[in-house]
């Protein structure tokens, strides 16, 4: 065997193979991908440089995610899984082999996407980043316990420590050792006094006065008493240590580990063998890390089980309009809607109450006096009323103690076995802070432990900025420093990573369910930096979402730091700054869907600008750009939010212009979502759409009479099952089925519209239930989905497919792209109009029957936009969008801007929360919230046209938008 040659073992899926080969001297420089065909990829070949910061870009739907997540990440994960035993694999869930010929030089892959945010109410920023675990350890090791009742410091000492402290008193000090046997308890306590006398003790201290046990002692049984047995009297001098130790042990036995030393000058020293308060008698268990976990019974508040809140039925949701009478349907909660029917049992109960307490059911609910209101809501307090009810067995009179609406509905909620009924009841509930822990989630004894004068909840409720200051200024004793040094080092490092990714406004106590996709992703990014792994391929999905331009530099510095550690970074991104900062940009396209899946260009941002085929390059170079409107439209009216103070909003008044497009801007965490989503949308939804929502804290909204409905167009899926698709969501499928049912063939066979649905029996293939595929469980291998062998994936039975419209079956039509269908249905105006809007929003490439589960968030949002555009507007609608540019390329943003202006042209109002400067510069009006995130935000910094905001010296948004105008 030659010098450069060696034999080495290669691990393959089939077992070990002995390969004779040459060991390469240099390390593999690239991740080499050959023949990638996942989703719309067209046998793509690409060499991605390793240990570099690589950006994948291209139009929405071009195949970026198919290459990054479905090919590179999936194969990296699969190879790791393959190295495990089949026993271990069955617990991990399997990954299918991606449709690719080969991938070489692939490092272990870690995906940080937006979808896998934990929605568990127990999950917080602190628990996800594991910083909270370090804080639990810190508090358990160096925390100072306090009595939760009186606030005094609680400490515990051994007998030797107690003796040493007493011996340290000035010599000749007269002391008496007291055993506190009764603390703050009512009663005569004859047995206690008798027992003390029998044990040979002579004196007791009762309520601060000294008594001889030989005298008659009578106590008032209705008063609380404190009784201490005087065990010994001593004068402090060197030779008393032996006697003192014996006496101290006696006291501790008598008083369950407590000792009070009374110096004759009136001072008292309290000692405890365990963590207990000598004054209040409250004792604490051993302090451990689990004492500070709200997910563990040892630490969690017993009342709310550590959630910090309770779901409780809300009177305002059960009776939304109090100007209506009960007879006219004021009570809308489940089970009581029937009380408008005079023959119902609920009405019979209310009639009986009205007769007993002399009130009318025809009176508007808001006019009832407090007594009647409380009877209806909270019950009759056990008092019965005579209910006359005509049932199936005739008329009966029943004695009923009315429990009140809230108790009644709570009982029904507990007793129902139906999940859907439970969900319906939950729409009448609101989240209220737990009365026992006031939202702090832990037991009082755990909240009594402090470090730097703050308990663990107070520390985790500080913003990351303030937490960093707290950690820097923390003053600890020498012993505390010695114990906590390593823990503090870990906490400081992890907290600084969160600040580095622009999350300095968040708190560790913030629930992860309330985080945006971008925030959740950046938190996981910070956690990964903390882990310090090297030689890994990190695959990220638009980490810049929700990040203001001001904080972009921080994020880019973090990404470069990950790269510099020795990792490969693959970032799916549309942000211009990120592309310019990358070592390499991979442009996939040229179009979307069928027209994408090819490698258009690869190289630096400068290389892309020179490439005539790259649309991305043309936008980067400025050859293509989104134009600034020549004039800004004038508002047709105003909507005024008064006294907004949800979360960090500082009791502000905000004017929203009507009939135009408004952008609400500001740095991350400034209060944009609190203002628009929590207050504006929820209040309008409640008042205009009659939705059961509770708006955020505010005084009022003036001008709602100018609107007739509010629509929130978000990026949530258009359906949760593969049975929903763009055709069903937009209403196209109904019209297409009408067309098929109207054909001569369908009429001759007697087929109605329902025959052409794959959701009901009749026309669908029954072998697969209209799914077109069958799932085969493989236990420790991944489940295999195979096309149905009866219909061959077409979802319908043979007879249905024989009915043709213009030579195409219903399956053929569902398989068409929007572009193909547009040409096919040109003669049918109602269908053509809906297809045209789908085409206009940039979805020419999606298939009409494409399962909604395969659509991205951006695609789902644009389908919703298309559905809105195709409706005939009233000119009184307000549309609310939260970061609609997520997942959109420059070219897609161009289309989106045109759509948003089309929506507002008919007199409708569009309110957009956005960081994308191309959208902001085209807005008619900007409301800039800030100036900072968290506590430093919550005020209106600037408002007006983009030109006016650009002149503001205090607006960060103005500074950046000025360059785009």
Where are these regions (language model features)?
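Conserved phosphate-binding elements of NTP-dependent enzyme cores
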Residues: 2-965
């Amino acid at each position: 065997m030659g010098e450069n040659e060696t034999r080495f073992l290669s691990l393959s899926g089939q077992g070990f193979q002995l390969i004779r080969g040459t060991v390469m001297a240099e390390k593999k420089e690239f991740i080499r991908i050959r023949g990638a065909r996942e989703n719309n990829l067209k046998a793509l070949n690409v060499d991605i440089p390793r240990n570099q910061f690589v950006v994948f870009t291209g139009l929405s739907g071009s195949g970026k995610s198919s290459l990054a997540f479905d090919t590179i990440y999936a194969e990296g994960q699969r190879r790791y899984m393959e190295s495990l035993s089949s026993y271990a694999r069955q617990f991990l869930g399997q990954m299918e082999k991606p449709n690719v010929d080969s991938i070489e030089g692939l490092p272990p892959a870690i995906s940080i996407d937006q979808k896998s945010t934990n929605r568990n109410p127990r999950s917080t920023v602190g628990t996800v980043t594991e910083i909270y675990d370090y804080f639990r350890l810190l508090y358990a090791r160096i925390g100072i316990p306090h009595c939760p009742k009186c606030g005094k410091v609680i400490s515990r000492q051994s007998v030797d420590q107690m003796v040493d402290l007493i011996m340290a008193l000035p010599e000749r000090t007269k002391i008496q050792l007291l055993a506190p046997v009764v603390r703050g308890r009512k009663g005569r306590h004859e047995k206690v006094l008798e027992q003390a006398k029998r044990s040979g003790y002579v004196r007791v201290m009762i309520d601060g006065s000294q008594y001889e046990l030989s005298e008659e002692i009578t106590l008032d049984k209705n008063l609380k008493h404190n009784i201490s047995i005087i065990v010994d009297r001593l004068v402090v001098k060197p030779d008393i240590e032996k006697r003192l130790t014996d006496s101290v042990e006696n006291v501790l036995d008598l008083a369950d580990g407590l000792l009070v030393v009374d110096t004759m000058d009136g001072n008292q020293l309290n000692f405890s063998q365990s963590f207990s308060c000598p004054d209040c008698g409250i004792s604490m268990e051993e302090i451990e890390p689990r004492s500070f976990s709200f997910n563990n019974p040892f630490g969690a508040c017993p009342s709310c089980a550590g959630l910090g809140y309770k779901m409780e039925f809300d009177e305002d949701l059960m009776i939304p309009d109090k100007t209506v009478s009960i007879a006219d349907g004021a009570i809308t909660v489940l089970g009581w809607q029937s009380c408008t029917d005079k023959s119902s049992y609920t009405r019979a109960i209310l009639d009986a109450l009205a007769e007993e307490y002399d009130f009318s059911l025809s009176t508007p609910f808001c006019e009832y006096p407090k007594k009647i209101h409380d009877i209806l809501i909270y019950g009759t307090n056990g008092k019965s009323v005579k209910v006359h009810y005509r049932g199936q067995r005739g008329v009966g009179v029943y004695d009923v103690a009315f429990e009140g609406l809230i108790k009644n509905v709570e009982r029904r909620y507990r007793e129902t076995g139906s999940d859907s009924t439970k969900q319906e009841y939950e729409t009448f509930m609101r989240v209220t802070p737990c009365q026992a822990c006031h939202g702090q989630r832990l037991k009082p004894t755990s909240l009594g432990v402090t470090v730097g004068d703050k308990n663990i909840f107070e520390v985790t409720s500080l913003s990351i900025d303030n937490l960093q200051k707290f950690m820097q200024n923390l003053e600890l004793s020498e012993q505390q420093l010695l114990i906590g040094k390593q823990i503090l080092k870990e906490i400081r490092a992890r907290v600084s990573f969160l600040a580095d990714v622009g999350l300095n406004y968040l708190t560790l106590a913030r629930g992860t369910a309330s985080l945006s996709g971008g925030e959740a992703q950046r938190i996981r990014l910070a956690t990964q930096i903390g882990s310090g792994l090297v030689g890994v391929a990190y695959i990220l999905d638009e980490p810049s979402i929700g990040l203001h331009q001001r904080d972009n530099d921080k994020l880019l510095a973090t990404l470069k730091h990950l790269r510099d550690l020795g990792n490969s970074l693959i970032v799916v991104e549309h942000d211009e700054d990120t592309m310019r900062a990358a070592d390499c940009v991979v442009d996939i396209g040229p179009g979307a869907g069928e027209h994408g899946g090819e490698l258009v260009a690869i190289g630096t941002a400068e290389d892309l600008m020179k490439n005539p085929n790259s649309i991305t390059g043309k936008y980067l170079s400025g050859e293509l750009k989104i134009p600034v409107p020549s004039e800004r439209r004038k508002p047709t009216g105003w909507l005024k939010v008064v006294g907004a103070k949800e979360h960090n909003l500082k009791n502000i008044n905000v004017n929203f212009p009507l009939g135009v497009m408004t952008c609400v801007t500001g740095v991350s965490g400034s209060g944009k979502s609190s203002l628009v989503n929590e207050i504006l949308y929820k209040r309008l939804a409640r008042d205009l759409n009659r939705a059961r929502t509770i708006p955020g804290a505010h005084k009022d909204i003036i001008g709602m009479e100018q609107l007739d409905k509010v629509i929130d167009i978000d990026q949530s899926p258009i359906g949760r099952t593969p049975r929903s698709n763009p055709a069903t969501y937009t209403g196209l499928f109904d019209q297409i089925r009408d067309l098929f049912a109207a054909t001569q063939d369908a009429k001759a066979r007697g087929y109605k519209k329902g025959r052409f649905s794959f959701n009901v029996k009749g026309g669908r293939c029954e072998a697969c239930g209209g799914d077109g595929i069958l799932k085969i469980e493989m236990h420790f291998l991944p489940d295999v989905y195979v096309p149905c062998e009866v219909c061959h994936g077409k979802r319908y039975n043979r007879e249905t497919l024989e009915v043709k419209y213009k030579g195409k079956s219903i399956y053929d039509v569902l398989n068409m792209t929007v572009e193909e269908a547009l040409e096919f249905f040109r003669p049918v105006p109602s269908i053509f109009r809906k297809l045209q809007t789908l085409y206009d929003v940039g979805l020419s490439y999606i298939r009409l029957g494409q399962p909604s589960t395969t659509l991205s968030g951006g695609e789902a949002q644009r389908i919703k936009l298309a559905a809105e555009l195709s409706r005939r507007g009233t000119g009184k609608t307000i549309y609310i969008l939260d970061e609609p540019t997520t997942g959109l390329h420059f070219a897609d943003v161009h289309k989106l801007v045109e759509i948003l202006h089309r929506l507002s042209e008919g007199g409708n109002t569009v309110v957009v929360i956005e960081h994308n400067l191309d959208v902001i510069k085209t807005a008619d009006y900007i409301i800039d919230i800030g100036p900072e995130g968290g506590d430093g935000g919550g005020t209106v910094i600037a408002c007006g046209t983009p030109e006016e905001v650009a002149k503001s010296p205090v607006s960060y948004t103005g500074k950046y938008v000025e360059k785009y105008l």
